[in-house]
Amino acid sequence: MFLQFYDKLTERLRGAGDWVAPLGLRFLLAHEFWTAGVGKFGVGTEAPNWFANQDFIFPFGLLSANANWVLVTWGEILAAIALVLGLFTRFFAFTLLIITVVAIAAVHWPASWDSLGQLWEGYSVSRVMDDGEFRGNFRIPFLFMAMIAPLVFMGGGKLSLDHLLLKFTQRVELIEQRNQDFLAFGIAAFIFGLVAVYLIPLWGVLLLIASAALSGYAFYQRQ
C-alpha cells in the first residue's frame, strides 16, 4: 500500500517537475548573469585594467581584452534573456558554462597548488590567503556550474519556448525519448572533460580520452 502510494506520488512529482523544475534554475541564473552582463555593459566596450591584465585560456587568449569584454558582456546578457524565455536553452546554458569556466581559470583558480586539500582551500566565497599565497574563491562559480549543468543536459522544461517549438515542428515526442547508449555518455564525458581540462588538466584529458573511447565504441556498434 505504501509503495503504491509512493509510486503514484513520485509519478505526479515527475509530471509536475517537467514543467516547473527547471524554472528556478533558469530564473536565478538569468538574474545573476543579467546583472553581471549589464554591469559590464555600463562600463562600455573598453575593458577595464583588471580585466585586461587577466590570462585567458585558449582560444580566448588569442583575442584582445576588448573583444573578450564584449563577448562576455553580450554573452551574459543574451543568455540571461534566453533563459527567461526558455529559448535555445541548452545552447545558451552551454555558453554560460564556457563563460564560467573561463572566469574560474582566469580569475578564481589558484596559479599553483600542491594537493587537492590545498586546492580545496579555495572553495570559498572570499579570497583565501595561506602564507601569502592566493588560494582562490571559486565556490560561487562552481555552484553556478552545478546549476547550469542540468539545463545543458535536460533543457528548459515544458514551460519554455523550446517546448512550443517542438510542438510547432511536430516533434513533441522527443521530450519523452531517452537514449542512454555509449554515445550519450561519450558526449557527457566530453562536456565534463572540456570543463576539467582548463582547471585540472589530467582529469580533463582522461575524460576526453574516455569520451573518444565511448563515442568510438558507439559508432563501432552501429556498423
In which residue ranges do the predicted regions lie?
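Short, basic/aromatic beta-hairpin or loop at an interaction surface
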Residues: 54-61
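Juxtamembrane transmembrane-helix termini
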Residues: 82-86
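Short Gly/aromatic-enriched secondary-structure transition segments
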Residues: 44-54
